[in-house]
């Protein structure tokens, strides 16, 4: 009886401060608010990104994923972070880098922290809902959220955005 209750609570889409996924907000790379209420009935792939990382080339596949599935209800949200000391210092620098080098047009947040006491509320929410596997261990960690605002799975940095594993989960969820 205890195990089913633990499983039930782990799958609730609430953080330990009572916030649901759709209560969250973040500023985009230009300073405009992204309200997660706008992501209801969408599948969201949240990826902490960085400009100076060995995985930075994944931007290309994130853009491909976005172009392939956005019309079906996928949101790719890049969250630039300097938590691992591999990001530019200014939002405009990140925006220009992504547009010039990778032709990115999926949503990017402002530069945020993704771990520790200063982690953005998105990552605090993810940790409280999915445990430590939702906390990025490195750049390009991926968190997949279903249409109900619940985390489906997380994927380590080395998991390519166009991998069969991620594609399969996205297609099942759309």
What is each of the regions a protein language model found here?
Residues 1-8:
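Bacterial N-terminal signal peptides
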Residues 124, 128-174:
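Thiol-/selenol-based redox modules, centered on thioredoxin-like
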Residues 55-120:
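Structural microenvironment flanking redox-active thiols in thiol-disulfide oxidoreductases
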Residues 41-44, 74:
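Alpha/beta-hydrolase fold active-site loops
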Residues 42, 48-52, 80-83, 148:
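Short pre-active-site segment immediately N-terminal to redox-active cysteine/selenocysteine motifs
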Residues 13-37, 57:
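N-terminal "domain-start" segment that seeds a small globular fold
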């Amino acid at each position: 009886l205890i195990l089913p209750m633990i499983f039930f609570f782990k799958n609730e889409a609430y953080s330990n401060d009572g916030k649901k996924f759709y209560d969250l907000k973040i500023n985009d790379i230009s300073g405009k608010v992204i309200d997660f209420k706008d992501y209801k009935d969408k599948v969201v792939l949240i990826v902490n990104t960085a400009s100076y990382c060995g995985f930075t080339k994944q931007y290309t596949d994130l853009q491909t994923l976005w172009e392939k599935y956005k019309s079906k209800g996928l949101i790719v949200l890049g969250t630039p972070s300097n938590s691992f000391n591999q990001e530019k210092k200014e939002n405009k620098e990140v925006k220009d880098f992504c547009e010039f080098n990778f032709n990115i047009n999926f949503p990017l947040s402002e530069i945020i922290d993704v771990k520790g006491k200063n982690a953005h509320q998105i990552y605090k929410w993810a940790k409280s809902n999915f445990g430590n596997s939702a906390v990025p261990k490195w750049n390009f960690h991926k968190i997949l959220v279903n249409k109900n605002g619940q985390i489906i799975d997380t994927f380590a940095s080395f998991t390519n955005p166009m991998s069969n594993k991620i594609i399969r989960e996205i297609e099942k969820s759309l």
